[in-house]
A protein has these predicted regions:
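Short, surface-exposed polybasic/aromatic micro-patch for ligand or macromolecular engagement
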Residues: 2-55, 235
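C-terminal secondary-structure termini that scaffold catalytic or DNA-interacting sites
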Residues: 3, 176, 211, 220-250, ...
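N-terminal core-binding DNA-recognition domain of tyrosine site-specific recombinases/integrases
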Residues: 3, 23-29, 56, 68-149, ...
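Basic, Lys/Arg- and aromatic-enriched nucleic-acid-binding interface segment
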Residues: 10, 122-130, 141-202, 209-210, ...
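Short, charged, surface-exposed hinge/linker loops at domain edges
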Residues: 49-70
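Catalytic-site neighborhood detector that most strongly recognizes the C-terminal catalytic loop/helix
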Residues: 157, 207, 220, 318, ...
């Protein structure tokens, strides 16, 4: 129910009840302006598009701060990523914008400005856009927006360049060049597809040489300040059992004997002075090794990409590759399919055959 009342000042007060039943009012210079406002408000309420005028004055930075503080489900590394994206790439440009002014045009101007500046790179811009879109989806649910203004087609898609693939000979050159205590990390990343975080969390009791399998159940992440924490792998698919290629069995046995304490929960990979390998320590060793063999362009994660490519060349199916590498993509299509451990062992054996063939007659530079 709405009404218009002429005030002693000569202005007209339009009054109405919001969807919660609360009485609200707004004054206008003319009766027609007041009636037009009530007509528009009535339509908005009927279409469920009405928004509390007080919420429209909220600054984006106020909401993003509250939003991040109320996401206890985020992993520490993800929380750190989001905090950095907000602090560096979103709030300096849009933080002082009130929700009533947060339009598609404003978002488009912000997005175009980041791309035009060239820093950060397009991948980071896509991450920032996706985060803003996620936050504003929640703002719609919380009643601050009628619709999400993040509607730029393709803006959240990361167009990363194709990563390089190392040859088997190059992998072994890297393994030979790196410090001996890290040699097995290079080989497991390549031939078992383990991520760096999964390698850093790997313990003695997760390696079964009798069955020739490695059980991946956790990963270790390290924040920018050096804080380390352990948790489940990146996705549910990351929890997996990976067949060990036969040609790596002797490598694993030698590593366990030389570098790993006898306790079942002992980490497979440690630093020279600590029981837990710091990321910076390994990065230094990795950078030295790749420079020594002329592969400065190769990142450690490229070894996992290399292993995926090699496994695919053995004839492994998509679902078998997903199971071996711990990929979560396309899971909906594969929900009723199960990768066979026997088939994974076949893939591992073929990887060994590929390795033996590639190393046969190879000459060190």
């Amino acid at each position: 129910m709405s009404s218009i009342r002429k005030k002693s000042s000569g202005r007209y007060e339009a009054r109405y009840r919001d969807p919660s039943g609360r009485s609200r009012g707004k004054t206008f210079a003319t009766k027609k302006a007041a009636q037009d406002f009530l007509d528009r408000t009535g339509v908005d309420i009927g279409d469920r598009a009405w928004r509390d005028p007080a919420l429209a004055k909220v600054l984006l930075s106020e909401y993003t701060t509250w939003w991040l503080e109320n996401r206890p489900e985020l992993r520490p590394r993800t929380h750190e990523l989001y905090e950095g994206l907000l602090r560096l790439h979103i709030e300096p440009y849009l933080g002082e914008c009130r929700f009533e002014l947060l339009t598609t045009a404003a978002v488009r101007t912000w997005h175009a400005g980041l791309l035009r500046a060239g820093k950060p790179g397009p991948v980071t811009v896509a991450k920032a856009y996706r985060l803003l879109r996620t936050i504003l989806n929640d703002a719609v649910e919380d009643g601050l927006l009628a619709r999400n203004p993040c509607s730029i087609r393709g803006a959240g898609i990361e167009h990363s360049p194709e990563r390089p693939v190392a040859t088997i000979v190059e992998v072994y050159r890297l393994a030979d060049a790196i410090e001996k205590r890290y040699r097995l990390m290079v080989l497991l990343a390549t031939f078992c597809g383990l991520r760096l975080g999964e390698l850093l969390a790997l313990r003695r009791d997760r390696v079964n040489l009798v069955n020739g399998r490695i059980e991946v159940t956790e990963q270790r992440q390290e924040l920018s300040g050096g804080t380390r924490y352990y948790g489940p792998p990146k996705t549910a698919a990351g929890v997996r059992s990976v067949a060990l290629p036969p040609h790596l069995v002797a490598e694993v046995e030698q590593h366990l004997s030389a570098w790993v304490p006898p306790e079942l929960d002992a980490f497979l990979f440690t630093g020279p002075k600590t029981a837990s390998l710091r990321r910076a320590t390994f990065d230094t060793a990795w950078n030295r090794a790749r420079s020594a063999v002329g592969l400065d362009h190769l990142h450690f994660h490229d070894l996992r990409h290399t292993g995926n490519t090699l496994a695919a060349s053995t004839g492994a199916s998509t679902k078998e590759l997903m199971a071996r590498m711990g990929h979560a993509s396309a899971r909906a299509a594969l929900i009723y399919q199960h990768a066979s451990e026997d088939r994974d062992a076949v893939i591992a054996a073929k990887l060994s055959a590929l390795t033996e063939e590639a190393l046969k007659g190879s000459v060190e530079p």
